[in-house]
Every structure is written in structure tokens, then in C-alpha cells.
């Protein structure tokens, strides 16, 4: 089976690291299983690292995860073998694209990266999923 490259939205990865099993937990787990099996290769915009770190730090501070869970999440992230992508988007262009796609700025970075590279995106975010349908970007 060929390996498929895809863009990993933080909304999916957050489900891997935080307890509670939100509405996208089953989907997120299926993505992780395919990554672990070597079927999928995750790519992320550089923004992903900042978002995930921020979520994990806040979860630890708010006592939603323990120090042990924080450390195990760090080990898991290092083991993902992520391909980090950088696309050029200045703030003015990001505002224009966000308005065009009806997305928040952060979500636009994920969506625009997948669109430019013509790779599918794994996301739980409703706005990103809608933009994918409207603008022809493949959802994983």
C-alpha cells in the first residue's frame, strides 16, 4: 500500500494528547492508527508546533493533564517524524485569505498549506471541513 502524505491540523493532534474524547476523538484515533501503521506521513505548518505546545502547557497549568502525561506527549510528538512545512504568508495576505475562506487566521494557515501543496488535510474543525468542500481541497 502506498504511503500518503497529508497535512495534520492541530485539532486532530490535540485529541491524541488530551483526555476527554471530544466529538472528533474516533476520527483522530483512526488517523493516528494509520500514521502508526506507516500508511500516512504527517506534514504540519510550522504553526502546528506552537499551537500544540500552547495547548499542552495550558492543559498542564490548568491541571487537565499531569506532568507525566505532558512528558509522554512530548515523547509521542518527537516520535511522529513530522515534516514541518513553511509557506510564505504575510499578515495582509492572511487576512485576505481568511476572509475568502471564511476561516480564522490559524485555520487559514492549515487550509492554505494543504491547498498550495495539493495534499489532503486531516481536521476536525468545521470551518476547515467546509472550506475543503467549497474550494476543492481533499479531506483525509
PLM region descriptions:
Residues 70, 74-76, 83:
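Extended, non-globular alpha-helical segments
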Residues 1-47, 59-72:
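Short, well-structured N-terminal submotif of metal-dependent ribonuclease cores
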Amino acid at each position: 500500500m502506498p504511503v500518503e502524505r497529508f497535512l495534520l491540523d492541530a485539532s486532530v493532534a490535540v485529541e491524541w494528547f488530551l483526555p476527554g474524547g471530544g466529538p472528533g476523538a474516533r476520527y483522530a484515533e483512526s488517523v493516528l492508527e494509520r500514521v502508526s501503521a506507516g500508511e500516512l506521513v504527517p506534514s504540519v505548518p510550522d504553526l502546528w508546533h506552537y499551537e500544540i505546545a500552547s495547548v499542552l502547557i495550558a492543559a498542564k497549568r490548568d491541571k487537565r493533564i499531569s506532568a507525566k502525561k505532558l512528558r509522554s506527549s512530548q515523547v509521542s510528538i518527537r516520535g511522529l517524524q513530522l515534516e514541518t512545512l513553511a509557506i510564505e504568508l504575510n499578515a495582509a495576505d492572511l487576512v485576505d485569505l481568511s476572509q475568502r475562506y471564511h476561516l480564522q487566521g490559524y485555520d487559514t494557515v492549515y487550509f492554505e498549506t494543504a491547498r498550495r501543496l495539493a495534499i489532503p488535510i486531516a481536521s476536525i474543525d468545521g470551518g476547515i471541513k467546509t472550506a475543503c468542500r467549497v474550494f476543492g481541497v481533499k479531506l483525509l
